Swiss-Prot record:
Family annotation (SUPFAM superfamilies): P-loop containing nucleoside triphosphate hydrolases
GO molecular function: GTP binding; GTPase activity
A GO CC term assigned to this protein in UniProt: nucleus
Organism: Caenorhabditis elegans
Quaternary structure note: Heterodimer with GPN3. Binds to RNA polymerase II (RNAPII).
Site residues by UniProt (Stabilizes the phosphate intermediate): 99
Compositional bias segments (type: Low complexity): 9-21
Lineage, top ranks: Eukaryota, Metazoa, Ecdysozoa, Nematoda, Chromadorea
Sites where the protein binds GTP: 40-45, 200-203
Family, per entry: Belongs to the GPN-loop GTPase family.
Coiled-coil residue windows: 286-311
Name of this protein: GPN-loop GTPase 1
Gene that this sequence comes from: gop-2
This protein's record includes keyword Nucleotide-binding: yes
Amino acid sequence: MAEKAENLPSSSAEASEEPSPQTGPNVNQKPSILVLGMAGSGKTTFVQRLTAFLHARKTPPYVINLDPAVSKVPYPVNVDIRDTVKYKEVMKEFGMGPNGAIMTCLNLMCTRFDKVIELINKRSSDFSVCLLDTPGQIEAFTWSASGSIITDSLASSHPTVVMYIVDSARATNPTTFMSNMLYACSILYRTKLPFIVVFNKADIVKPTFALKWMQDFERFDEALEDARSSYMNDLSRSLSLVLDEFYCGLKTVCVSSATGEGFEDVMTAIDESVEAYKKEYVPMYEKVLAEKKLLDEEERKKRDEETLKGKAVHDLNKVANPDEFLESELNSKIDRIHLGGVDEENEEDAELERS
């Protein structure tokens, strides 16, 4: 049965038993895998096959479904967004369409995602990896505030890897292939997390063509010559040259979610990506955190200075005549230090002759 984020204990007594929160990511914790991809690329089937593969190895995963619109999840799920937010009720209540309702559900789930992180941390010793299946409409997750919050929350807590699923059958079209690679590049530079491109449906079309296109520009150029649209050819050719550097450091895996082919390679790529997270992402995260702390300190000092200046101006404007205000302040100080006994002459002074 799926766990609900709301059901996580949060009493002070239970919280006191837990270790104090860490200042940075726990690099020794099991990794989380964010599964992204275009609609129809086979994300859910991929998660199903990977879940079965891990169970067969006696290393079960912790599975989270973040797609509120799916009618049936074909794998055992530990946390299900549908238990927290009702997709159809959101559409009905707010008068939204499918995409708007998905984004609203993610926004609502996002408000409780700290509890999901706590569940992941609590169960970490019981699973090998945490798999997160995202909505079919990729833009609803990757380009929304809630998607960024979920991704950043995971990445700042423990090792996190992004898997981008590509439909190999559709990618045989050079233009579609380039669209997928451009989208993958944008997600990589947006998240800055270790990134794996998974060419799915290898049982239908062997994705070796895609690997050759990524390694050799001339092969991709030859494939473009067979296409009809000259405008798209020129654009794809230009983009291919631009993305050449992107291809160099990109991990790629070819799999078939239908037959189970290539999933050993998936696990190897995950292990390599976790090491990349430790060596590349964590130092970058700590640097950004230190810079933010420094900026916050500078902003605090500026606010304090502005507050003091504002108070001085306010005190000066309390009277219509500043000179009278200063004179009254001076008299007030004199009164505070006046010891008395000099307002009247004493007897000896009175007997002195005055010229």
